[in-house]
C-alpha cells in the first residue's frame, strides 16, 4: 500500500505527534467501531473519541491517556487539518435534517 495521505506534525512539549490523513476505508472502519461506552473516552471532545486518536496519529492509547485535554486539543486540531473532509462530513451529519 502506498502512503499518499496528508501528514500534519504537532509538537506537544517533547512529544512529536504525527496526524495522518486516513483512507476512506480506514475512516469507514473508524466510524463502524463501537467499543463499550466510556463517558470520558467518548464525550470529552465533540468530534473525536479518545480511542480514535491512535488511529489518526502515531500516539498509543497509553500516551493519549497521559496527555491533558489542552494538549489533546492541539492533537485534534492536527487531525482536523489532516482530515478536513472527514470532519466536514461529521459536521454535516450533525445538522438537523429537513423534513418534508
Regions flagged by a language model, labelled:
Residues 2-100:
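Short, surface-exposed, charged amphipathic helix/loop patches that serve as local interaction elements
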Amino acid at each position: 500500500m502506498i502512503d499518499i495521505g496528508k501528514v500534519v506534525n504537532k509538537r506537544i512539549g517533547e512529544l512529536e505527534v504525527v496526524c495522518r490523513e486516513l483512507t476512506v476505508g480506514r475512516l469507514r472502519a473508524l466510524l463502524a467501531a463501537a467499543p463499550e461506552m466510556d463517558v470520558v473516552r467518548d464525550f470529552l471532545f465533540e468530534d473525536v473519541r479518545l480511542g480514535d486518536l491512535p488511529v489518526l496519529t502515531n500516539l498509543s492509547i497509553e500516551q493519549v491517556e497521559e496527555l491533558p485535554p489542552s494538549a489533546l486539543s492541539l492533537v485534534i486540531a492536527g487531525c482536523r487539518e489532516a482530515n478536513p473532509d472527514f470532519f466536514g462530513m461529521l459536521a454535516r451529519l450533525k445538522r438537523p435534517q429537513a423534513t418534508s
